[in-house]
Amino acid sequence: MMRRLGIFAAAFAVAAAGFILLGNAAAALITAAVTGALAGVFLLLRDRRLRAARIFLLGLCVGLLWCAGYRAVFLGRAARHDGERLPVTVTALAAPSETPYGAAVPVELPLEGRRLSCTLYLRESAEEICPGDCISCTAKLRLVDARSKKASDRYSQSHGVWFRLSAGTGAAVTHPAHPGVRFWPACFSMLLRQKINTVFDADSAGFLSALLTGDRGGLDMQTRNELSIAGIYHTVAVSGMHVSILLGMVMQLCGSRRRLAAAIGVPTIVFFVLMTGAPASAVRAGVMQTLLLLAPLVQREDDPITSLSAAGLFLLLVNPWTLLDVGFQLSFASAAGILLFAGRLYRALAERRALRACLRRGGIGGQLAAVLVSSVSCSTASMTFALPLSAYYFGTVSLVAPLVNMLTLWAVSLIFTAGMLIALLALVWTGAAYGPAWLLSWLVRYVLLSARGFSKLPCAAIYPENFYMTAWCVLLYGAILFYALSPVRPRFSVTAASLAAALCAALVCAYAQFHLPYFTFTALDVGQGQCLVYQRGTWTAVIDCGGSTWNAGEDAARYLQSYGEYRIEALILTHYDADHAGGAAQLIERQRVERVFLPRGVEASDLKETILAKAAERGTEVIFVDEDLLLSFDGGELRVFAPLSDKDSNDSGISVLASAG
């Protein structure tokens, strides 16, 4: 069966990708003319064998024309105000988020007859701002450059942000008596988060808020990292799983009444997608589930591939630069893998003798076996296309993901269903929601503790930081592709054993290279900061661990673990500025640090207290450098010099001299 919409959508996506990469409107228009002419020639030939080619060429032509004219149509003359400082009145589209310098607010800016999505940056707290509020201020307008390769610009482009507005302080906020209907989903999301924070314990409220509303602000970086390593971070990124669970609740309520299910389900899905901020993954799932509900009503058979194509085409028509969104790429890659290969993998696993007997037996055992096989099949199939993207963007390949998904996804489904009902109850009667919330918090803790426990296992995840780990990741991806595509599959146990043996060989080679009896001194790329790794034989020291982000400690841990090193003999922090010590606590959390050497410091420091608390928690010995120290080891030494002054944080820092040979 030829899926015309799928071919057209694929061609449109190829055209959008080509335009974004090249960024040449003139070349795009010429190419569109050529492809359009070829499509016309193929149409005149009336050869059925050329039907797919005609549709593909037409998709290329339309896609290139749409991308070439997109900014002119939607931005218009507003672009001429780039760099100007103007008095503006904008409307808040969602709740503000904190930044290191104040707050960022998604807003709508009326300019030159257009209503443009922008981000307003304030150098003050913005907690009182709600969706629908009017904000008046004087702001400098900075147009997001469509040809820029900066990560921040690409993120803005992928989310449809046209301008960044820098307003400083003194913004006047007006609260309307009744926000417009289009702000109801965002207002409801904000109210739901408030009730979740009220009735749930602090350690579970952040997870519930992320699961139900897509707001991950309540999850600390350590929890996010543990969820990522364990392979279940997708549970707190609103996606098809969440929309499917919500639709399942509606279907249970409506039974076999399809019209009622569509009448309730479609508005519910639309409201939920808007409530969670309409990320690409949620929109994709929303479109697919909506088509699933509507197909029987118009006497059509639901075709998942066509639904996936329709979702992609819709998102690219709204904003072709959505292609740059990592969530868009991962969502469609995972969905395509599941649609194409999950059924095949399920049948292959179900043919195994032991599983076949369990599945045929029925009862609770059969149901559990079906859930097990389904979970493993979907997890593996979703990796078919998503694995290289995950490795590229996040530098992580979780090995425990299939097992952790199998152990926790049932709990996540229950948490979502019960959590939504409890949050809705809290809106009506807050006091009655405390008891159920307390009970559900234990299930949330089970998921979080599972993620924490599995993330701390050796080789829970592989980090392609060196040749050996990268080669093994390529081998793993090849095995998944072979298992998914080949009609003749080797025994699963043989494949797993071969991959395990290859991983052991890669780890041994990496460990041997890192621990050869010579001196290595590595400066890690941690942004605006410093993290130095000194290694001689089996003795490892890290000097400073800070950067422009929290990730410095995680980056150092992943670098060391990619070489099979889970131990650090000495962590030396020269002073307590974030660019030198901001990632130290995370490094102590992720590695076995024997000793940490610190300056006394002359000022109270929250960062210092955080490092000391983490060291006490992990059993790391703390040594304050009040006098010069000599750390000797086989083949080298480190001289640690005490501070020469106590005037301020920089002057009271310690110095290190590394020697080898």
Q: How does the language model describe each region?
A:
Residues 1-79, 284:
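N-terminal leader/targeting segments
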Residues 1-22, 295, 421-453:
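Hydrophobic alpha-helical segments
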Residues 15, 90, 327, 386, ...:
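Residue-level signal for inorganic ion chemistry
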Residues 19-29, 398, 461-467:
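Membrane-helix interface and helix-disruption motif detector
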Residues 37-38, 54-55, 165, 220-402, ...:
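Hydrophobic alpha-helical transmembrane segments in multi-pass membrane proteins
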Residues 61-234, 554-561, 567, 601-603, ...:
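Membrane-interface helix/helix-cap signal primarily in integral membrane proteins
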Residues 88, 108-114, 121-138, 151-155, ...:
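Non-globular, low-confidence helical/coil segments that flank catalytic cores
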Residues 391-437:
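Hydrophobic alpha-helical transmembrane segments of integral membrane proteins
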